[in-house]
Design a protein with these regions (language model features):
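Formylglycine-dependent sulfatase
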Residues: 1-139
Length: 139
């Protein structure tokens, strides 16, 4: 969704790019006190694999990150990555946002449409109006 959907283009389009003037709307600025948000998702590990959760395995970098942030102790996961990803991205039960099964598989029934419903909203969509930007690395 565009950040400024109703704002008219204020640049100039001419016969060539060189003679044209690009334009971008001014971005919303986050207040200086706005915290950074970093979500790190690990694949195929359990909470007992990290030192910050009491494991004897040494994980100093993860432990330092954990000491400066939040540690979750109760997150429901399923045996499928699509459903867990939907819950993580929205903060809601995966059925309630339309991903009760594999992504891109639409069963034709509510809760099993195979994609996150537009009206569900993701964390990134909820933070965008507050000047947050997101970036994802990985699979």
């Amino acid at each position: 969704m565009p950040e400024h959907p109703n704002q008219a283009f204020q640049g100039e389009v001419r016969k060539t790019v060189k003679k044209s003037t690009p334009w971008w709307p001014q971005r919303t600025q986050a207040p200086p006190s706005a915290p950074n948000i970093l979500v790190v998702l690990f694949d195929d590990v359990g909470f007992s694999d990290f030192g910050c959760y009491g494991s004897p395995i040494k994980t100093p970098t993860i432990d330092r990150l954990a000491a400066q942030g939040l540690l979750y102790t109760g997150f429901h996961t399923t045996a499928m990555c699509s459903t867990t990803r939907a819950a993580l991205l929205t903060g809601r039960n995966h059925h309630s946002v339309g991903v009760g099964c594999l992504a891109n598989f639409d069963s034709g029934f509510p809760g099993y449409r195979g994609k996150i419903a537009k009206e569900a909203g993701t964390l990134a969509e909820m933070l965008r109006p507050h000047a947050y930007r997101n970036y994802m690395v990985g699979k």
